[in-house]
Amino acid sequence: MSDPEEERVADSTAHYEEAGKVISIPRPSDEAEGSDVMPEQDDEVQELTTESEENVERHSEFSLSTPKSDDSKPREEVTSLGSASGSQDQDYRLLDYQKGEDDELLFLHKIKAIKETLQTSVRESIATVKIVLIPAGQEIIMPFRVDAPFRFLKEHFAHLLHIPHYVLQITHEGIIVGNNESLIQYGIKPQEIVQVEVFSTLPDQYPVRRIEGLSEGSQIITVTIQTSIDRYEEVAVEIIKSDFHKPFLGGFRHKITGLEYHNAGTQTVPRKIPEKDNLFCRDTQTVFQKKKLQQTTNTTSTQMTKIGVYVSNMTDKLLKPGNYFSAAEYHARRLHAVIVIQTSYRRWHAKRYVESLRKQKKLRLEWEEEQELLKIQEKEEWIRMDYYRRHNPKTTEDFELLYNALELWRQEEVEQICHYSSEAERKAALCELLEKETQMIASIGRHRSAARMERQDAAIQAFLDKCSAPNVWRRGDGKTIEMDTQFTIRARELQSIYKCILLKDLSQDERLDILLTLKHTVKEHECKLTQEILELIDREVDLMMRGVKPHNLEGLRKRITTLFIHYIKTPLFNPEVAKYLKVPQDPLKFYDTIYFCHSCQNYLPSVEFSVSPTSHRVYRCRHCINLENETQRRESFLKYKCLLQRLYYSEADYGDNSQIAFLMQLQDIKYLTENIWASQSALSAWDDLNDLVMVRWDKHVEWSPWNCILLTKDESTAHLRLPSIEKGYGHHFVHKIKHKHILAKNYFSQIPTLASLILNDDEVEDIRSKHSTKSPPKIIITRRIQPH
């Protein structure tokens, strides 16, 4: 082999060795950490780099297969050992190596171009983010990539705040952002400024506090620095805006220019010295004394007036020593000051305390006066209502009150008549008394007939309003939904015709129009009732044409009105009325709710019977019982009814599902009041039933006849405030009350059985909700029909 060939072989070998060394160099760790390449692109670059390294290693192993000892020998020995055939193989091998080297270098240049492109795109995709910590109010400005997920930002601040990252929440413009969302999804472009808020979802357990590492008003900016010839790196730098005044460490001032030259200076805030905790050791508890003279160095000097320097004495002050006082005088002065302060404070505190007592007394007297005024007003209102009931009786209770007053008057008159001396005078007086009583009963009967007619008209109007009302539902939000059906519209049309029939003082033409409308409405159905109505309409029209006066037609018009009411109450002509009839059309529905009255010999529904908890069978209806009371005893149950109503209201307010109280009837409460409690308060013996209430003896136990006490309203309020009955009352009084409870339990022993039988009955719940003062409005939730 010639010398040029040897040189070419040596150069190529050295060149391949150099290429192998360049390719086998691993990627710098700082470059890998500084680059912000996306995960997908980073994986692609890593795969390409791995493949290139494998190819280079394969070629390097093949090219460097000769031992190192051969490389150390002289070049002449290497060429002398080769033959002609060996030189040809080596030429082919060198050509292959040169071709592979060019491909590898081209591949490495592509990888480098991809990295530079990725770094440039990452550098250009950064936005400035202003983070506000809530509620600390600290603002931090830092760069952040627009395509990076928010979870990186959340983890960064979780590390700074020492809070778990899942507790932190980030919002942008009031919208909570997700962990995998980025700024670019919210329309943020690179190089823009955006503000986000960071707060804690558990502020009590993990509060957001200020970051002590960052000073007030600090900002974080990104600075590009050059780390090598063709390599740049971005570094986050914190700008601290602080009003820290650097200490003066000595220096001098130039007299001519006035410039100050300092011996030393600083630009950063000194580190905060951490506070030491309390030490519990010998050094803090033991005093070591040492006698040693020490002269401090004079580090400062006083500038006085001299040549070239003038110091003004305008601000100088002349200090004079005060009067000397001893320690005893000092302590005496302090003691006098303490006495003055305590005296003033005690006087001020006493004035405030007396003023508060005066205000409390004034409020108490005003409250007592208001209560007395309310009681007087209630008494006057009760007397006024009693007077109104006697002169304008409307309800059954009003007529009971009249019959009771009549009976009391009769008994007084009989007592006076019994004092007459002769028998003839007594008989004459009794006959006269009987005649007066008969006249009063007749007067009461006339009032009852008028009241019955008014109630009947009002009941008919209420019945028609109920039938013509649309179906109403209440939604969950409180609003109502109304719906009219063909049946409600039909009922409303019949109601309007009925109201027109009742109108008076109409002209003849208007009356004829109403009758014509009624005739067309009734003619739609043919039956005996409609035929009778049509005949009466034709008769009224005929009489009106003959000039009959209106007051002579009142009976005929009343018959038409009555028959038309029967027409409206017929479900065949008015289907909506079927839901409100007392007697249903299907006999099987009321088969189990019909009872026989042994007094009037009528079959009546169960609501017409008053069943007492102590009764064993249904015997007489309400009407027969009231009739017997009017003819014989003439008792008034109005006061007992009010007492029972107050019991219902008080038990409904407890809300503990009491049962027995709502089973009590008028006869039961009357027996309990008169026979057990003697119609008077158990404490004060007050006998006015209008002021008495029946409350629980033990407020923690359900009301029952054997767990009650009859007291006045004020006494009941004080009784229910007692924490313990045994401590609030004496032993003798408690024994007397328990004896009354035993008597009541023996009489009402059947009530617990009835209460257990109707435990799931809805009627008791309806009564409780009716008398409850805290019951919310009933809400009907509409449900959609499920597809089959």
UniProtKB/Swiss-Prot annotation:
Tissue expression notes: Expressed in the flagellum of sperm cells and cilia of tracheal epithelial cells (at protein level). High expression in testis, also present in brain and lung.
Gene Ontology terms: biological process: cilium assembly; epithelial cilium movement involved in extracellular fluid movement; flagellated sperm motility; mating; smoothened signaling pathway
Compositional bias (Polar residues): 80-89
Result of knocking out the encoding gene: Leads to an absence of radial spoke 1 (RS1) complex from sperm axonemes. Leads to flagellar bending defects in sperm cells, and consequently abnormal flagellar beating and asthenospermia (reduced sperm motility). Male mice are infertile, no effect on female fertility. Elongated cilia. Increases levels of phosphorylated MAPK1/ERK2 and MAPK3/ERK1.
Ion transport as UniProt keyword: no
Disulfide pattern: none
Domain IQ residue range list: 334-363
Domain Ubiquitin-like: 127-203
Cellular-component GO terms for this entry: 9+2 motile cilium; acrosomal vesicle; extracellular region; motile cilium; radial spoke; sperm flagellum
Region (Disordered): 1-89
Keywords assigned by UniProt, alphabetized: Cell projection, Cilium, Cilium biogenesis/degradation, Cytoplasm, Cytoskeleton, Flagellum
Cell compartments where the protein resides: Cytoplasm, Cytoskeleton, Flagellum axoneme; Cell projection, Cilium
Biased composition (Basic and acidic residues): 7-20, 68-78
Annotated function: Anchors the radial spoke 1 (RS1) complex to the A microtubule of outer doublet microtubules in axonemes. The triple radial spokes (RS1, RS2 and RS3) are required to modulate beating of the sperm flagellum. May play a role in inhibiting signaling via MAPK1/ERK2 and MAPK3/ERK1. Additionally, may play a role in the functioning of cilia. Not required for the functioning of tracheal or ependymal cilia.
Protein name per the record: IQ motif and ubiquitin-like domain-containing protein
